[in-house]
Amino acid sequence: MVNIGFICEGYTELFILESNNFKALLNQLGLHSVGVINVQGNGNLLPHNIKSHRENLFKKGASVIFILTDLDQDQCITKTRLRITESENQIIIVAVKQIEAWFLSDNLAMNQIFQGDYSFEYPENEDIPFETI
């Protein structure tokens, strides 16, 4: 079992990363999450802000840390990765669209949440899917 840790920028990512289904997936892959830290906003993913979070996850036994963020208003994935800064034993995952766009595309989940007939034809075209939800 490989111990990993996560640093994310918001509650949506936190909800997914701490879900039982995600933990079961990690287990199937031979991975164990030692913790998820929500820095509450991508501006808090700057190196001086995440240093202590990385240290805490490593102290808990993580051998690799995954940082999850959205592209947001950045024009380029590379610029987003450079803003966060690459580090040893760290993987930066940049979602091109905000993760909330995935919810807009999941008709079954949205039907359960809103208890009705839900359909959203082009979630990938939403500039700010969180506000749409």
Regions found by a protein language model. Give the residues of each.
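RecA-like P-loop NTPase motor core
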Residues: 1-60
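Short coil/turn segments at beta-strand junctions that form active-site/ligand-binding loops
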Residues: 2, 61-64, 88-90
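Activity-critical C-terminal alpha-helical subdomain
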Residues: 77-133
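A broadly tuned preference for mixed-charge, low-complexity surface segments
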Residues: 50-69, 112-130
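Acidic beta-strand-to-loop metal/phosphate-binding motif
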Residues: 5-9, 62-74
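A short linear-motif detector with a strong N-terminal bias
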Residues: 43-47, 72-73, 83
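A short acidic (Asp/Glu
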Residues: 15-18, 76-80
